[in-house]
A protein has these predicted regions:
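Chalcogenol-based redox active-site neighborhoods
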Residues: 1-157
C-alpha cells in the first residue's frame, strides 16, 4: 500500500482490541489520535517506546494513543497488564487488510517481512493527518517529543 500523507484525511481502519472486538478510527472522532505503530511488543525497543509514550501522552488533553502491531490481541493484552499500561489502547492489525493497505507501513522484505514498520502518526480532531514519522532503522526510537508537540498543537489549527 501507499504511505498516508500529512494534510490528508486519515483513512478509516478496523483493528482488533484485546476482547477481539473491532475498533475503527472513526470511533475516536472528536479526539486527537496518536498511532504508535511498531513490529512487535516482543522487540526491546518497542516495549520501551510504548512505556515512554504511555507516560507522556497521558498528559495530553482529549488525546487517544493507539499502539498498533501485528501481535495477537492476547499477547498485547498480557503485555499491557504486565507493564501496567492503562492509558494506551493496544490494537492488533493481524486481520486488518484495510490498515495494511491504506497506511503503507508493512515491511516488504528482510527478516521482519510482513510485520509493521515503526512509525508515529498524529491525527487531529477532524481526522486529518498532521504528523508522520517513519523510522527506517528498526532498533531506533521514533522522535516522540515531535509527535507529542504536534499533537498538542493540533487543536489550534
Amino acid at each position: 500500500g501507499k504511505m498516508v500523507k500529512t494534510g490528508r484525511k486519515a483513512p478509516d481502519f478496523h483493528l482488533t482490541q484485546s476482547d477481539l472486538q473491532d475498533v475503527k478510527l472513526s470511533d475516536f472522532k472528536g479526539k486527537k489520535v496518536i498511532l504508535n505503530v511498531f513490529p512487535s511488543l516482543d522487540t526491546p525497543t518497542c516495549a520501551v517506546s510504548v512505556r515512554e509514550f504511555n507516560e507522556k501522552a497521558s498528559g495530553l488533553e482529549n488525546t487517544v494513543v493507539l499502539c498498533i502491531s501485528m501481535d495477537l490481541p492476547f499477547a498485547q493484552s498480557r503485555f499491557c497488564t504486565t507493564e501496567g499500561l492503562t492509558r494506551v489502547i493496544p490494537l492488533s492489525a493481524f486481520r486488518s487488510q484495510d490498515f495494511i493497505q491504506n497506511y503503507g507501513l508493512q515491511i516488504a522484505d528482510g527478516p521482519m517481512k510482513g510485520l509493521l514498520a515503526r512509525a508515529v502518526i498524529v491525527v487531529d480532531k477532524k481526522g486529518i493527518v498532521r504528523h508522520i514519522q517513519l523510522v527506517k532503522e528498526i532498533s531506533q526510537e521514533p522522535d516522540y517529543e515531535a509527535a507529542l508537540e504536534r499533537a498538542a498543537t493540533a487543536t489550534t489549527e
